[in-house]
């Protein structure tokens, strides 16, 4: 998803979540004095964390392939045979997004929002998040709404949505969707959104609204030793990692408001991982070790998922995500260069759009196959699968290039940013004084 930051300078380019935070042009973490993030004052000019942008694309593809299992009997069959245990745990890609969101939002905004609560700064942050998330989401909600108008003339809402619970299509249901509040009123995620994975947008929007208050606490912990912060990150994830079906603390099915525990644990864990990464210089961490460490951690996650074999026990892998993200943020050398490839960067920047559009094409594929005259043979299934994959790629590009980014820039331009307004006032004051209009 999904999931879902505009500094007072150039437009940012990175964004982890289906709710998709961007990096506000953030610098490499823990890379020495020249790149060190101030502990109490924000820097205003920062390069992108390209490695995390690439990770966002990988996480989005993980979720997409998890949902594409309806096509596992097409030409994609070899992919699913080879990576079945990993793809079966594709819902963990959502947790990657949530942890990334906490990490990058904290890295970008902690020093702006943390020292003390200011309504203007908090409002600027919330508006930046709204401008990033809402336009593309609202458009997809509208398209899916038309899809329901067409389909429910023949099928029930529940059947047409391909969910176990029917989403609310009433005017109030539409209002909840457009306000991105649709998950807040439900104990479970199924049926909360008009399209399955849309629940993550609502969850992440709630996390963003809470962050200005959370930042007040995190700012007081910003000088934690990196090992202590990393330990806090892992401990924060324990409730969502060990409690559930087929986990060390087993439950009978999913529990009410489990989604709230999931977003809270992952987002806060990402925040602590950020504190650990930005303080890495305190333990004289060698950035040259970050790349190999990230590769080792990622490999360990894949091996663990392949061994676990099913989504229940595989959920324990979430405990490794803070370490993986922290190490990637510190990565230098060839791995950073490889992850900075243009196609990975574009995929990461457009990952929110990919997350939003892909499910619609899966719906199309399912219903076309089901209602195909005289049944769809292998050739038809392969052709439809190819068309749907191409449609996903094209729709992602169009939504990102012509809706998500332009709408974000226009909405941000409607409200002057705190930093920009301050600079404008200072410039006006200097100009006034230089013209002799000020007091001597």
Name every feature range the model reports, one short phrase each.
Residues 250-258, 262-275:
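Acidic, glycine-rich loop-and-beta core segments that form the ion-binding/anion-interacting portion
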Residues 217-225, 276-288, 308-311, 336-341:
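Membrane-interface helix-boundary motifs at transmembrane edges
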Residues 107-114, 274-278, 326-329:
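Regular secondary-structure segments
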Residues 144, 148, 152, 274, ...:
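Juxtamembrane/transmembrane-helix interface segments of polytopic membrane transporters
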Residues 1-242, 251, 263, 350, ...:
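Membrane-cytosol interface segments of multi-pass membrane proteins
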Residues 263, 267, 271-272, 291-405, ...:
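Alpha-helical transmembrane segments of multi-pass integral membrane proteins
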Residues 190-195, 248-257, 303-313:
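Membrane-interface helix caps and helix-loop-helix hairpins in membrane proteins
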């Amino acid at each position: 998803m999904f999931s879902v930051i505009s500094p007072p300078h150039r437009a940012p380019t990175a964004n982890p979540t289906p709710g998709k935070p961007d990096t506000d042009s953030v610098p490499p973490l823990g890379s020495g004095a020249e790149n060190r993030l101030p502990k109490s004052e924000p820097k205003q000019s920062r390069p992108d964390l390209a490695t995390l942008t690439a990770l966002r694309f990988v996480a989005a593809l993980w979720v997409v392939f998890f949902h594409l299992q309806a096509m596992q009997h097409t030409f994609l069959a070899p992919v699913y045979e080879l990576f079945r245990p990993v793809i079966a745990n594709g819902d963990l890609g959502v947790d990657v997004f949530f942890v990334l969101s906490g990490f990058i939002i904290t890295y970008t905004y902690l020093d702006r929002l943390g020292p003390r609560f200011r309504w203007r700064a908090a409002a600027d942050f919330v508006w930046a998040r709204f401008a990033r998330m809402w336009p593309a989401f609202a458009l997809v909600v509208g398209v899916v709404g038309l899809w329901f108008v067409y389909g429910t003339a023949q099928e029930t809402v529940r059947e047409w949505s391909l969910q176990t619970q029917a989403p609310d299509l009433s005017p109030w249901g539409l209002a909840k969707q457009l306000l991105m509040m649709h998950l807040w009123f439900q104990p479970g995620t199924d049926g909360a959104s008009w399209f399955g994975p849309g629940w993550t947008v609502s969850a992440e929007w709630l996390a963003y609204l809470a962050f200005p208050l959370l930042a007040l606490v995190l700012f007081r912990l910003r000088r934690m030793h990196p090992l202590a912060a990393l330990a806090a990150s892992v401990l924060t994830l324990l409730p969502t990692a060990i409690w559930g079906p087929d986990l060390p603390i087993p439950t009978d099915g999913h529990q009410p408001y489990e989604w709230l525990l999931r977003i809270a644990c992952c987002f806060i864990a990402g925040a602590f991982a950020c504190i650990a990464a930005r303080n890495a210089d305190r333990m004289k961490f060698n950035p040259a070790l970050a790349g190999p460490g990230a590769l080792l951690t990622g490999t360990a996650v894949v091996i663990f998922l392949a061994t676990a074999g099913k989504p229940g026990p595989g959920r324990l892998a979430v405990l490794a995500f803070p370490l993986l993200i922290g190490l990637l943020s510190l990565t230098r050398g060839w791995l950073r260069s490889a992850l900075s490839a243009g196609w990975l960067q574009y995929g990461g920047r457009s990952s929110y759009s990919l997350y939003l559009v892909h499910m619609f094409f899966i719906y199309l594929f399912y219903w076309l196959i089901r209602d195909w005259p005289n049944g769809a043979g292998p050739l038809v299934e392969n052709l439809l699968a190819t068309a749907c994959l191409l449609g996903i790629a094209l729709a992602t590009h169009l939504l990102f290039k012509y809706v998500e980014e332009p709408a974000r820039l226009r909405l941000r331009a409607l409200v002057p940013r705190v930093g920009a307004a301050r600079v404008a006032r200072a410039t006006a004051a200097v100009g006034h004084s230089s013209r002799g209009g000020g007091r001597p």
